[in-house]
Amino acid sequence: TVPSDSDFKVIYGVEAYLVDDLKGMVTDSQNQDLDADYVVFDLETTGFSPETNRIIEIGAVKVQNGKIVDKFSTFVNPQVPIPFRIEQLTSINDSMVIDAPVIADILPEFMKFCEGCVMVAHNADFDMSFIKKNCQRLDIPCKPTIVDTVALARVLLPNLNRFKLDTVAKALGVSLENHHRAVDDAGCTAEIFVKFIEMLRDRGMSTLDEVNAMGTSSVQNVQKMPTYHAIILATCDQGRTNLYKLISLAHIKYYHRRPRIPKSEFIRYRDGLLIGSACEAGELY
């Protein structure tokens, strides 16, 4: 028991597993028709961070009316050695990129290839983070509409537990050869996306805004989405009550392998709470 005259203060809080269920399947939608032109692309890189790692391969296919009509494929000279683990994963080595164009020369060509098209990728946040960072460095405008086939798969293929490209391809009967090579992964993703378009039409949808309106925050989807560490602290009695509610929801309603707090629920019970990004497993990292 803390003495009443003590200056010791108890602060209620928790290190939580936060799920971003507010992010749509389509980013920066202009309410394009499902019959829009698409560029489905994939990157291979030297690592996971666009701040410190480099693009080593760009592969893309252009889709019009459900058919692949054009391709874009190139190695990119990263001007640094390719790490051994990346060489093992992609089979791309230094000798294959030594004579390739550098990103400053090839990225303008790629963005021109994408002009007027919706951009599509599997786990689009990763690939677009590299595209946007390099566009920023090179002062190239970059504000496309982006569709994430991972987010679509969570909604359209609810029976799957994992949504890696090879898993989704197998579920839909799509061939995937030379996995972790950009143009092959892009072609596979394009075939998957064309099938998803038909599934969306079967649900009566005709625009990308309607796709986003489906939402991603069902209990089943939250249970399959990635989690980020977060620190949540209560600043008052109301906050402590809301903290208890969130912890109860995380353990009773959304639990799957770990207790999960969706951002939508956090916003609902936001009063009296402070949130931080926690450790290296937090969203900011």
Feature roles, as predicted:
Residues 1-44, 61-62, 67-68, 79, ...:
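Phosphodiester-processing cores and adjacent nucleic acid-binding clamps
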Residues 47, 58-59:
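Early-domain small/polar-rich strand-loop-helix modules and first-structured segments
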Residues 70-72:
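A structural microfeature
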Residues 74-89:
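Short, surface-exposed acidic-centric catalytic microdomains
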Residues 43-51:
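Short acidic, Gly/Ser-rich segments with clustered Asp/Glu that frequently serve as metal-coordination loops
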